[in-house]
Amino acid sequence: MSKRQENKKIAFIHPDLGIGGAERLVVDAAVGLQDFGHDIIIYTSHCDLTHCFEEVSSGQLKVSVHGDSLPTNLFGKLHIFFAILRQFYLVCWLIFTGTIKNYDYFIVDQLSFCIPLLKMFCNSNCQVLFYCHFPDQLLVRRTSFLKKLYRVPFDAIEEYTTGSSDQIVVNSNFTKQIFHDTFKKLNHIDPQVVYPCVDTETIVDTNASSNSEVSKFFKDSPFFLSINRFERSKNIELAIKSFARMNKLMVTKAIKSFARMNKLMVTNKKPRLVIAGGYDSRVAENVEYLAELSTLCDELNLINFTIRGKLIMMPPSVDVLFLPSISTQLKNSLIQQTELLLYTPPREHFGIVPLEAMLAKTPVLAINFGGPLETVVNYNGNNLDEATGYTETGDFTKWSKIIMKHYNLDESTKIKLGENGRNRVINKFSRKKLAQSLDNILN
């Protein structure tokens, strides 16, 4: 623990306290700093106690909601305008009630609009830290000239307000470089890197029921796993194409060894690909993308099957299994029992799923770009003392060779890769490490 003269009063300001990756980071940071003895509260414009993390719903963290009565959009448009309006309302409440004077630090993330107001009205010793997950202006699709014109003032506001904070931190060295490339007027600022985390203090959230459900369902048949939201940006087709290519390589190799092929046919222990993740039938892209992935399987002669709910039965001929909207316990059981996690997003600025896999002693294959280069240590055959998986370009032919190579590795090497991954997460990506990094910066 870092040394402090006294515990501080710290307020987080976050737009919508749901269950996304940004919210997970805010909750972990808040709990970690609270465990260090600081007085913590989270201010937000929206928090549904039936759709939030347990630390929030249980009351472990204090949460104060202001501005939820204001709309989030107008006919599906103007999202950024209303996000700013809701945050403005929240900060006005802090100002007019005098509450803004109560804190030693404000930690703001996602939306930087309020920072100049906080600086103007907070007490003279108060400091504001901004946590930049990724520049908001790079997350927006500018599909028309009007949309580009509409974003101009908001992009300028983002750059100005971000630069007005006392401290800026980012979630990876990759995001740090993007920060410099995007905010040209802030080239005098050098953000510090504070990595997101996973909770390493508690046992991975599985139970005997979900573990048994997975093992009985697959009957000791090996499977590879891809976990992502069903969104096109997640590049899940890379996993499918790689798996299809690997299947062809395996068949070619098996034909040369008839006995091995016969064994696979008799025991039905052929490897499968499981694609699981966030899915909402109300979201058009989720529905469309799942259909597109199923069509891709058909084109590649991969028999695919979709299960919504409990794992009970699937045809033995299935190659690819889709599992939309699975529980946390089932997700973690799949991670623990898979041969290899296939992490396919091409421009991920960090990525929590690889950490979850490594914590569960599961090796990871990820694209060698962005955040995963900072979390996954590539196994090159000579670094078994530290490797945790594989990083490779997003070429499905190269991925297929790595998948097959890993599948045929001796068990001791697989175990060592898994142990390395868990140790790396505990040492570099724990909640205590996150809180300690923030605590050091604030002090």
From Swiss-Prot:
Reactions this protein catalyses: a beta-D-Man-(1->4)-beta-D-GlcNAc-(1->4)-alpha-D-GlcNAc-diphospho-di-trans,poly-cis-dolichol + GDP-alpha-D-mannose = an alpha-D-Man-(1->3)-beta-D-Man-(1->4)-beta-D-GlcNAc-(1->4)-alpha-D-GlcNAc-diphospho-di-trans,poly-cis-dolichol + GDP + H(+); an alpha-D-Man-(1->3)-beta-D-Man-(1->4)-beta-D-GlcNAc-(1->4)-alpha-D-GlcNAc-diphospho-di-trans,poly-cis-dolichol + GDP-alpha-D-mannose = an alpha-D-Man-(1->3)-[alpha-D-Man-(1->6)]-beta-D-Man-(1->4)-beta-D-GlcNAc-(1->4)-alpha-D-GlcNAc-diphospho-di-trans,poly-cis-dolichol + GDP + H(+)
Statement: the UniProt record of this protein carries the keyword Membrane: yes
Main localisation: endoplasmic reticulum
GO cellular component terms, A-Z: endomembrane system; endoplasmic reticulum membrane
Molecular functions per Gene Ontology: alpha-1,3-mannosyltransferase activity; GDP-Man:Man1GlcNAc2-PP-Dol alpha-1,3-mannosyltransferase activity; GDP-Man:Man2GlcNAc2-PP-dolichol alpha-1,6-mannosyltransferase activity
Membrane topology of the entry: Single-pass membrane protein
Residues modified by glycosylation: 173, 207, 304
Annotated localization: Endoplasmic reticulum membrane
Pathway of action: Protein modification; protein glycosylation
Transmembrane segments: 80-100
Keywords, comma-separated and alphabetical: Endoplasmic reticulum, Glycoprotein, Glycosyltransferase, Membrane, Transferase, Transmembrane, Transmembrane helix
Class of this enzyme: transferase
Domain of life the protein comes from: Eukaryota
Biological processes per GO annotation: dolichol-linked oligosaccharide biosynthetic process
Classification via CDD domains: GT4_ALG2-like
EC number: 2.4.1.132, 2.4.1.257
Its job: Mannosylates Man(2)GlcNAc(2)-dolichol diphosphate and Man(1)GlcNAc(2)-dolichol diphosphate to form Man(3)GlcNAc(2)-dolichol diphosphate.
Family the UniProt entry places it in: Belongs to the glycosyltransferase group 1 family.
Name of the featured protein: Alpha-1,3/1,6-mannosyltransferase ALG2
Species of origin: Candida albicans (strain SC5314 / ATCC MYA-2876)
Gene from which this protein is expressed: ALG2
